[in-house]
Swiss-Prot record:
Zn(2+) 3 binds at C85, H87, C104, D107. It holds the Pfam family zf-rbx1. The lineage of its organism: Eukaryota, Viridiplantae, Streptophyta, Embryophyta, Tracheophyta. GO terms for cellular component: cytoplasm; nucleus; SCF ubiquitin ligase complex. Zn(2+) 1 binds at C52, C55, H90. This is RING-box protein 1a. Its main location: cytoplasm. Pathway: Protein modification; protein ubiquitination. It comes from the Eukaryota. Widely expressed. Expressed in shoot, siliques, meristem, flowers, floral buds, open flowers, leaves, stems, roots, germinal seeds and seedlings in dark. Expressed at a higher level in tissues containing actively dividing cells.
Length: 118
């Protein structure tokens, strides 16, 4: 039996009848029991970068170039590119950036592709 708070006690499903006797021996009655708990989880990419630092869109959304051409662009074409510095950008954004500068936009280290794709 795990106590979360002084007023709340979680009781596993099989121990409900034995805990009635135990709780009757306690002088202070509990306010409520949790009989069922449905946990919810959220899945996310295991990367620290949530937004592309160049276009400021979420890294898993379309970049601004693909949003402008949304009729012809698909999410498969708008992929993520990682550098050896572990910074991630939309491939279209970093490609445009690399035409003028061969460095990472965030740490100014020489850019080299580490990984490309979803």
């Amino acid at each position: 039996m795990a106590t979360l708070d002084s007023d709340v006690t979680m009781i596993p499903a099989g121990e409900a009848s034995s805990s009635v006797a135990a709780s009757s021996s306690n002088k202070k009655a509990k306010r409520f029991e949790i009989k069922k708990w449905s946990a919810v989880a959220l899945w996310a990419w295991d990367i620290v970068v949530d937004n592309c630092a160049i276009c400021r869109n979420h890294i898993m959304d379309l970049c601004i170039e693909c949003q402008a051409n949304q009729a012809s662009a698909t999410s498969e074409e708008c992929t993520v590119a990682w550098g050896v510095c572990n910074h991630a950008f939309h491939f279209h954004c970093i490609s445009r950036w690399l035409k003028t500068r061969q460095v990472c936009p965030l740490d100014n280290s020489e850019w080299e592709f580490q990984k490309y794709g979803h």
